[in-house]
Amino acid sequence: MSLTLESLNQKNTRSLKAVQTEVESINRIALSVDCVIFGFDENKLKVLLIRSDLRKFQSKWSLLGDLIHINEDLEAAAYRILKQRTGLSDVYLEQVQTFGSINRHPAGRVVTVAYCSLINIQHHKLNIFDNELHWHDINNVTDLAFDHQQIFDTCYRRLQKRIQEHPLGFNLLPKKFSLRELQNLYEAILGTKMDRRNFRKKFFAMDFLIDLGEIEQDVPHRPGKLYKFNYGKYEKKKKKWVGIDF
């Protein structure tokens, strides 16, 4: 007797109850969220770290993270954890990657999802609670708790790629900025020195800078012209914009 397509489909499928029973019988796996918050201040790229409250990692720094609640979406958990640990609420978090090495957490099987953000430190005030919370120069970040060094490195590489694909950096600058400040920002994030003439040539070619006809005031170096970013022009051209190749 030949089987119909419908009967074959029924034979190869499982009921919801069967799947539910299987899920309940599997060893529990916890899910957490870790937030990597980058900030720019004093021409340096920094990352926000908190002292680990786990005895095994006593005195080590860690990212901002915690387990998610059973009735909570991933993104909601990320914003809740960030708010609880830092007081920050008006930042944009972008999901980066999932980390699930078997032995990444000493308490058991914990899979974590990393979120990343880039903010202007001067525009955000931190609330310091029981744990130490500090901005650290990214060049001094080593030996973090758990697998947080790997998570940090991954998010940093993602940030370096993103800032060449999108003009994220302008949100970190004053509304009026000099080309010197702009170059300092990109050098800090990309971790490399750039040729001054070539850098300026690339940005002028994009035609997203507006010359304000003003110069810097009270600076210890030769005053430079002040510019602002033309967000309106960028919005019109962003679909065709291929980024900046340094």
Where do the PLM segments sit?
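Core subunits and conserved enzymes of cellular information-processing
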Residues: M1-N9, F40-E42, V47-I50, N71, ...
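Acidic, metal-coordinating catalytic segment for phosphate/diphosphate chemistry
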Residues: S2-D34
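N-terminal strand-loop-strand
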Residues: V23-W61
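Active-site segment of metal-dependent pyrophosphate-handling enzymes
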Residues: I29-V33, E75-Y79, K83-L126, R162-G169, ...
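Short histidine-centered catalytic/ligand-binding loop motif
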Residues: L63-N71, N171-L172
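NUDIX/MutT-family hydrolases
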Residues: C116, K125-L159, I163, P174-R180, ...
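Short helix-coil junctions and helix-kink-helix linkers
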Residues: N184-K193
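Long, intrinsically disordered, low-complexity Ser/Thr/Pro-rich regulatory/activation regions
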Residues: I215-F246
